[in-house]
Amino acid sequence: MKFKYGTVVLGSFLGLSVVLAACGARGKFDQFDDGKIKLASSLTSKAAANALQTIIEKYNIVKSGKDYPIEITQIAGGYDGGRTDLQTRVSVKDKTNFYNLILNYPDLVSVLARSGMELLFDKVNVDKLEPNFLKFNEQISGVAKSGNYGIPVSLSTDILVLNGPVLHYILNSAKKEEANSQVKSQIKTSQIQAKGSLTIDTDENTKSLWEKIQNSAKANGETNQKGRKAAKSNKTALVQLKNGADTTTNEENKDTKTSDDKVKQTWGDYVEKDDGLKNYTFRASVFENWHDFLDFSTRVAKSFTEKVSNITNKKGTDIQGVLGVDSSPNVLFASVFAAGGGNYENFFYKLKDGRADFSNFKNKGSSYQNLQSVFKD
């Protein structure tokens, strides 16, 4: 009977990677060689599962004749289900039905390492991978020696989405009228609200962002005679504010008042306050770091007391806040990692003598200090 190596884990701190299993020592075992590579997947998204299936089918077509075909083994329960299934099969030394690859997070390598089932990718060419994407391997504890035990397959991405029309109403309500500016030449004088004292910086990034914010409000205000959105292919209310293309057309026929008036119905009136947007200078860089972003969001909330900061008797359809977060853990992890300079040694744990060291959580530890800094923000 032929045997083949055990398990590969696909998963990383940012996404998915690959881990192999070895044989010969205490706890290790070989699998029966069934002439195929089993890839365990616990993906819960149908679209992602279908995409994976398409990739595997393509690989099986183009692979060389001497290479084994890949077969997907579906595991229920998401990543946690995959972890439980792997732990069970390793503990009972399942030689027949155990898989060779698994899509999961890289800490599963440590689970395999307890039984000596981890294996280095020492013969895999990773030249086409960004080295930073492989750094998670340096944070895996309990392995026999350092190296690449996992290879990233996909990455998780956090994005920031700005509501252009709403942001325009907020800034336009708070800013002071400028005597001679490009902004004034593009907007009707009657539309410029001279209530506040906010200024918009004149650096190139801010000027570009402000122009796109204006364009999104103009597009949002365009309606047909029936009061519905104009359905022209070259017009959209959603403009890629930071990096999108310029969508300005027929500027003389566009204005922002319609959009601002509609947004005002939901957000209420602007109130000039010392701890709000009074004398505030708006810059595009406010969206590039956590501290300034939270400060700006807080100031906006305090500047719209009627609809935002007043939490008494709020309904589900009312404005719940300025900043919405889809995943609180991801925001916490990303902000703490950034506060530590993007250095794993300053993150939640670090490796010491091959083992996880959580001393960073002590009062004077870097992780504790960074968590405290983020919390105070």
Curated annotation (Swiss-Prot):
Region (Disordered): 217-260
Signal peptide start and end residues: 1-22
InterPro entries: Mycoplasma_lipoprotein_cen_dom
GO cellular component terms given for this protein: plasma membrane
Residues with lipid group (S-diacylglycerol cysteine): C23
Keywords annotated in UniProt: Cell membrane, Lipoprotein, Membrane, Palmitate, Signal
N-palmitoyl cysteine lipid attachment residues: C23
Cited PROSITE patterns: PROKAR_LIPOPROTEIN (PS51257)
Topological type in the membrane: Lipid-anchor
Subcellular location: Cell membrane
Biased composition (Basic and acidic residues): 251-260
Residues that span the membrane, as ranges: none
Short name of any one Pfam family annotated for the protein: Lipoprotein_X
Domain of life: Bacteria
Membership in a protein family: Belongs to the MG185/MG260 family.
Protein's name in the database: Uncharacterized lipoprotein MPN_281
Source organism: Mycoplasma pneumoniae (strain ATCC 29342 / M129 / Subtype 1)
